[in-house]
C-alpha cells in the first residue's frame, strides 16, 4: 500500500542518505551505534527491505478552518522485521491511501532496535525470545511494564500491545498496564517506549560484546 522508491530512483537528500547509497553504511545497526539520525524513510527501505506493517487504528479527526470543518483520516501503523526492529507512526490525510503512506514514512523515521534475551529466572534456554529485563514505557495516561517470561508463555498482553511486540520479535512476555488502555495510540506508544528502554543501558552479559 505504500509507495516505495527503488534503489536506482532514490536521490538522497541528507548526508546519512548519501553514505547509505554509496555503500559506506551497509547495516541499519551502524546508524544506531554511531547515533546517526534517520531523516529519510528511504534509508530504512534501502537497509531493511523485509519490513512488514500493520494498521493498528483508523479514526476520523476534524479541523475547523475558515472554509468550515475539514474531516481527515488518522491512521496508526506499526512496522517491524520480527527480528529486533520496530517502528510506530501516525499519518493524517483525506484519503486512506495517503494517510497510510504518511504513517509508514513516520514509522520508518521512528524505527528503533530492540534488545531481546532470556531474562526470566524460570527459563535458561539462552534464546532471544523475550525481553532481557523488566522495562516500562509511558504515553499519556497509559503505562506499560514488560517483564521477561519463560519460553512457551506467549504474549500475555492486550491486542494492540501484542501487535507491537510481535513485530519487534518478542515471543514471550508478561505485561502489566495502567491507565486508559482503550486509547489505542497511547497503548501502542507506551509499549513502543518500553521496548526502546531495552537499549538504554547494558546488562552484564552485554559488557563483553561492547569491549
UniProtKB/Swiss-Prot annotation:
* GO CC annotation: cytosolic small ribosomal subunit
Q: Which SUPFAM superfamilies does the protein's record reference?
A: dsRNA-binding domain-like, Ribosomal protein S5 domain 2-like
- S5 DRBM domain location: 51-114
Q: Which GO terms describe its biological process?
A: translation
Which Gene Ontology molecular function entries are recorded, alphabetically?
rRNA binding; structural constituent of ribosome
- List the NCBIfam families: PRK04044.1, uS5_euk_arch
Q: Which InterPro entries match?
A: Ribosomal_Su5_D2-typ_SF, Ribosomal_uS5, Ribosomal_uS5_arc, Ribosomal_uS5_C, Ribosomal_uS5_euk/arc, Ribosomal_uS5_N, Ribsml_uS5_D2-typ_fold_subgr
Protein name, UniProt field: Small ribosomal subunit protein uS5
Q: What does this protein do?
A: With S4 and S12 plays an important role in translational accuracy.
Q: Tell me what organism the protein belongs to.
A: Ignicoccus hospitalis (strain KIN4/I / DSM 18386 / JCM 14125)
Q: Which family does it belong to?
A: Belongs to the universal ribosomal protein uS5 family.
Q: Which Pfam families match?
A: Ribosomal_S5, Ribosomal_S5_C
Q: Which UniProt keywords apply?
A: Ribonucleoprotein, Ribosomal protein, RNA-binding, rRNA-binding
UniProt key word DNA repair: no
Assembly and partners are described as:
Part of the 30S ribosomal subunit. Contacts protein S4.
The protein's superkingdom reads Archaea
Secretion signal span: none
Q: What is known of its domains?
A: The N-terminal domain interacts with the head of the 30S subunit; the C-terminal domain interacts with the body and contacts protein S4. The interaction surface between S4 and S5 is involved in control of translational fidelity.
